[in-house]
Curated annotation (Swiss-Prot):
Positions of region (Leucine-zipper): 303-317
Keywords: Abscisic acid signaling pathway, DNA-binding, Nucleus, Stress response, Transcription, Transcription regulation
Protein name in the entry: bZIP transcription factor 23
The keyword Magnesium is annotated on this UniProt entry: no
Alphabetized PANTHER family for the sequence: BZIP TRANSCRIPTION FACTOR 23 (PTHR22952:SF103), CAMP-RESPONSE ELEMENT BINDING PROTEIN-RELATED (PTHR22952)
SMART domains, per the entry: BRLZ
Region of interest (Disordered), ranges: 166-185
Organism encoding this protein: Oryza sativa subsp. japonica
Cellular component terms (Gene Ontology): nucleus
A biological process term (GO) from this entry: abscisic acid-activated signaling pathway
Amino acid sequence: MDFPGGSGRQQQLPPMTPLPLARQGSVYSLTFDEFQSTLGGVGKDFGSMNMDELLRSIWTAEESHAVGAATTTTATTASVAAAEHAAVGAPPVQRQGSLTLPRTLSQKTVDEVWRDMMCFGGGGASTAPAAAEPPPPAHRQQTLGEITLEEFLVRAGVVREDMSVPPVPPAPTPTAAAVPPPPPPQQQTPMLFGQSNVFPPMVPPLSLGNGLVSGAVGHGGGGAASLVSPVRPVSSNGFGKMEGGDLSSLSPSPVPYVFKGGLRGRKAPGIEKVVERRQRRMIKNRESAARSRQRKQAYMMELEAEVAKLKELNDELQKKQDEMLEQQKNEVLERMSRQVGPTAKRICLRRTLTGPW
């Protein structure tokens, strides 16, 4: 873009190098006029839009239209730029949706931003020509419709270099990929048993004829543990067998075998107490269940005996009732037979002599 006091378009650009957004074949390579003609349906002018609306229009055009320019000139420029990008091997920029606007710039219109760029851009470029050089010829001032979207966004401060050029991780070399990573440093331990750095389980000290020897039984083979002796050093081969020195003075008791932190056949006192408590509780539960069954059985037997007794009493009372009814019936029949039978007295009227005649 040409400004008064500048020699050309490229001399008037700010020191920051424009980002290769147009090399991706996007709408950023179009000018405002070409972008306006490409959209066609936008009724609002770009100059009256604020920066937020402009970015939304650009994102909508990127999603709805195919990659490339609308005219033959822009298509050729995009293909050449893509070839240069493939030859240079520059990494692709981020998606346009990740562009951010400063808070003071988001509500400004495109015309206001363009006027600010014209005011501040001309003054900074006026100091570029030297005193010995002849004054450059005056050029026509570039308008907003002739500037590309990429250049406008770069000069407005929307696009940042750290946003569009992500760091490229270095490719691993074949030698580095083939070599395995070094193992982490192992912590030094007082005693090494085989290839393990874990402390071995300790064993009660072995009694010698002239002192005590503190020993340990290891899990790994070939590891040696130094044993301290008042007279001569005695070493162990990791399996409980003493080497180096007179073994006749050792006690005849064998070295106990260590199995998972304890002696074989011996359980921890806490586990023994838990098992014993569980067994006692189980025995108590069984005894309580047996007593409950006995009480229930005795109660059932008592109820059965009482029912049998009541049945016998009922039968006796039934018999007595039948006898009483029979006796009453017999008495009634006997009384009736006395009144009707031959032995009954006949009651009749007799004539009495009441008169002298």
